[in-house]
């Protein structure tokens, strides 16, 4: 008998951590929008992480233009110095968010409570 289950789980971004990351990105001069937390986000490898622990999978724009991901135009934009700058600022924002999680008990608690609320019970039983 062959049994299968999804290789990648759907994503459950942890809104309290996403909001903290957004604030940290603003501190380094990068504006960003957060998606509606009621939306479905599709599956990916980070989904497998997000069903176990609070996680984020936010997006930063590398250009002011709307360019489809995984396209030749996106590859060209990713090779520009502006994209490198966004990557560096993104790393700064992630580091700041990690530090916030280490130092801020209320953020950790909010993340844990949110995670418990949004991840379906059938994942918790595995």
Name the predicted role of every residue range:
Residues 1-126:
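Metal-dependent amide/peptide-bond hydrolase catalytic core
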């Amino acid at each position: 008998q062959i049994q299968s289950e999804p290789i990648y789980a759907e994503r459950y971004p942890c809104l309290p951590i996403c909001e903290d990351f957004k604030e940290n990105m603003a501190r380094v001069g990068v504006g960003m929008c957060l998606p509606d937390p009621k939306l479905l986000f599709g599956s990916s490898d980070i989904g497998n992480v997000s069903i176990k622990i609070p996680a984020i999978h936010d997006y930063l724009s590398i250009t002011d233009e709307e360019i489809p991901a995984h396209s030749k135009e996106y590859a060209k934009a990713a090779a520009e110095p502006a994209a490198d700058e966004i990557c560096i600022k993104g790393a700064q924002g992630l580091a700041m968010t990690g530090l916030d999680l280490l130092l801020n008990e209320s953020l950790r608690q909010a993340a844990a409570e949110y995670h418990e609320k949004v991840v379906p019970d059938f994942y918790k039983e595995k």
